[in-house]
Amino acid sequence: ITWLSPLQNENYREYMLNSPIMLQKLNQNKLLLSREELNFWPQREPLWDAIGVGNMKDSEEKILVLVENKSNLKELRSKLASKNENNKRLILDTMKETYDELGIKGDFNKWFDTYYQIANRITFMHQLMKKGYKVKVVFLNIVEDYMYNNISKTQWVDEYCKMLNEIIGERFVPRDILIIDLKVHEDK
């Protein structure tokens, strides 16, 4: 994986996929994505904690890796906050389209009133895959960080199972999503 953000020489800046700098970086790495292909979402897109481009195994085909980092269980919960009615409508329509196309049985209301950030990441992945891109979304959870939030792997697993059951209708991790638990401090 070639990481495009966050980079030390850019002061660890996070990017939206549609930012001119990120589109240029993606294109330079042979992942040809245009702003028009992102028109399923308003101009103000989610900021990704990390964005990378990799090669598919035994192929020249590229894969887009989008990372969302979590260090606190409370960060899993969020609501759609857009005040612009046109933007809100576009977001809800795109999320509902994703929900329907994936055949999800969970509570759609939880997508925008309880677990919005997680659901919009799933939506981005699905919409890009519909356009022919290979995409992986990584939820990177910080585990047992006794210097900040001492959350165990068990706590993360329990919370994700609960969330997935509510938004997906089952306790499984959707295909092309990876949940990684990272222990940042090995010794106390």
PLM features: what roles do these ranges have?
Residues 1-26:
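A structured, charge-rich N-terminal accessory region that forms the first stable segment of a protein
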Residues 17-60:
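Active-site metal-binding core of divalent-cation-utilizing nuclease and nuclease-like domains
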Residues 45-49, 62-66, 113-115, 134:
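Extracellular structured ligand-interaction cores
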Residues 50-52, 63-71, 121:
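Conserved catalytic cores of phosphodiester-cleaving nucleases, focusing on short active-site segments
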Residues 59-60, 73-77, 130, 145-149:
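Short catalytic/ligand-binding loop motif for oxyanion handling, primarily in non-cytosolic enzymes
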Residues 66-73, 140-144:
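Short loop/turn segments at strand-loop or loop-helix junctions that form parts
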Residues 75-137:
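Acidic, metal/cofactor-coordinating or nucleic-acid-engaging core segments within structured domains
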Residues 119-188:
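Non-catalytic C-terminal interaction segments of nucleic acid-processing enzymes
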